[in-house]
UniProtKB/Swiss-Prot annotation:
Cytoplasm listed as a keyword: no
Native species: Shigella dysenteriae serotype 1 (strain Sd197)
The name this protein goes by in its record: Probable ECA polymerase
One biological process term in Gene Ontology: enterobacterial common antigen biosynthetic process
Superkingdom, taxonomy of origin: Bacteria
Gene name as annotated: wzyE
Task performed by this protein: Probably involved in the polymerization of enterobacterial common antigen (ECA) trisaccharide repeat units.
Complex formation: Probably part of a complex composed of WzxE, WzyE and WzzE.
Transmembrane helix found in the keyword field: yes
Family that this chain belongs to: Belongs to the WzyE family.
Matching InterPro entries: WzyE
A single GO cellular-component term on record: plasma membrane
Topological type in the membrane: Multi-pass membrane protein
Protein keywords: Cell inner membrane, Cell membrane, Membrane, Transmembrane, Transmembrane helix
Chain segments annotated as transmembrane: 6-26, 37-57, 63-83, 119-139, 155-175, 181-201, 207-227, 228-248, 341-361, 378-398, 410-430
């Protein structure tokens, strides 16, 4: 890449970044937080944060990248995607009408809410316990990170339930919403994330998500400022780099350490070059249609229920890894959101996907606002826990693609909804057995005086 070509790419990158950052800033000033703000920051991180890192790798370490015209296409496709997404998100689908009291779909009380978070936490802890009994601490047993996807590891399906510890702790926080509950959320979820990091053998997702939710709650409540958020972001990047070194068993120093930091940070937070690689091989892609979305559900079907279930699932990430990169190491390489759309239907699917994503984020913001307006604090805690708990799925959406997001968000909704139903059933059983006693003002006063 020549200096002139880099200059042209830099101008396009700067314009796209300023365009998205400006719209995000105005939205932040208006509402302080919603899921449009979160997705916009996540989109910036995924598709634009990596460009400066790539530039340093090219000019400092002479690393080969896709041709400049392909990199330009990647930047422009990301910018155009966001423009279509933003217009879709801001388009009102129906006229605003005065709030009319409606019969709520469901309601929650104190016992049901506490039972819900206990069940969610129980699912996570039991899953971790069973996985640990089968495999021990994989971080200290395996020689390479790719081995966690091999037949040596049993009970891999249990990992999908680990994440429900975070929604459980979110319910606990939203029931109190003070600084002590906020700090307890951080300590408990990060400690759990570190535990799963050692047990699973290097998976950092639970740590990243817990830290991100902690920061956004702090921004919403005004407990941290923007400069503190930026400082925490830098600390998070350094922390993820250190965990990556431990995961891959790397011991580096000097120029090698700087080089390793650049490419690991780019691959962790901003795999935008993967989109460029897909565009570079555009003519060789056999468009998969909506099949990757259907195939991604295969991993949630146990083999005893479907004996003939394919052992290798050809979703967009695996198609990109196996067919485009010809990589059969056992790791699935993230195609990014736009890359998954390219795999499914080429350039035509990019604006269509942007419209779909705009509607998805609009739905999450509708739920979030519903929780903000809810007068029943127990129901509000459940709604907010569901919304913030889905942040992991939004990260999957930006990094892994639409197909991975759909299967995971459906799984999340089913498990979360099942926990709600079980909690309500248990409450009904306890109440029928006479084990539930309603609190009265007189009994509370007696407890206080005693």
């Amino acid at each position: 890449m020549s200096l002139l070509q880099f200059s042209g790419l830099f101008v396009v990158w700067l314009l796209c970044t300023l365009f998205i950052a400006t719209l995000t800033w105005f939205e932040f000033r208006r509402v302080r937080f919603n899921f449009n703000v979160f997705f916009s920051l996540l989109f910036l991180l995924t598709f634009f944060f990596g460009f400066p890192l790539t530039s340093v790798l090219v000019f400092r370490f002479d690393v080969g990248v896709a041709p400049p015209e392909i990199l330009l296409q990647a930047l422009l496709s990301a910018g155009c995607f966001y423009a279509v997404y933003y217009v879709t998100y801001k388009t009102r689908l129906r006229k605003r009408v005065a709030d009319v009291p409606r019969r709520p779909l469901f309601t929650m009380n104190r016992v049901e809410t506490n039972l819900t978070w206990m069940i969610l936490m129980g699912i996570a802890l039991v899953s971790v316990g069973i996985f640990f009994m089968h495999n021990g601490f994989l971080l200290f047993r395996l020689n390479s990170y790719s081995q966690i996807f091999s037949s040596e590891v049993s009970g891999v399906a249990l990992k999908r339930f680990f994440y429900f510890f975070i929604p459980a702790m979110l319910v606990v926080y939203f029931l109190r919403q003070d600084s002590k509950a906020w700090l307890f959320f951080l300590v408990s979820t990060v400690a759990f994330g570190l535990l799963t990091y050692m047990i699973v053998g290097g998976t950092r997702a639970n740590i990243i998500i817990a830290f991100a939710i902690f920061l956004f709650i702090g921004i919403i409540r005004g407990w941290i400022s923007l400069w503190m958020l930026a400082a925490a972001g830098v600390l998070g990047i350094v922390g993820m780099f250190w965990l990556a070194l431990k995961r891959y068993g790397m011991n580096v120093s000097g120029d090698e350490a700087f080089y390793t930091f650049l490419y690991l940070t780019r691959d962790t937070f901003s795999p935008w070059e993967n989109l460029a690689l897909l565009l570079q091989n555009y003519d060789n892609i056999d468009f998969q249609g909506l099949a990757p979305i259907v195939r991604d559900f295969y991993v949630f079907i146990p083999s005893w229920l479907w004996p003939g279930r394919p052992s290798m699932v050809l979703n967009s990430a695996n198609y990109f890894t196996w067919e485009v990169l010809n990589n059969h190491s056992g790791l699935a390489i993230s195609p990014t959101l736009i890359g998954s759309l390219v795999v499914m239907g080429g350039a035509l699917f990019i604006p269509l996907g942007a419209i779909v994503v705009g509607l998805i984020i609009k739905w999450f913001d509708w739920l979030y606002e519903l929780g903000n307006r809810e007068t029943n604090r127990y129901k509000a805690a459940i709604l907010h826990s569901f919304c913030f708990g889905a942040i992991f799925n939004m990260i999957v959406l930006a990094r892994e693609g639409l197909d991975s997001f759909v299967s995971r968000v459906v799984f999340f909704i089913v498990v979360f909804g099942a926990c709600l139903m079980i909690a309500k059933l248990l409450y009904w059983l306890f109440e029928s057995a006479g084990l539930i006693h309603k609190r009265t003002k007189s009994s509370l006063r007696t407890q206080v005086e005693g």
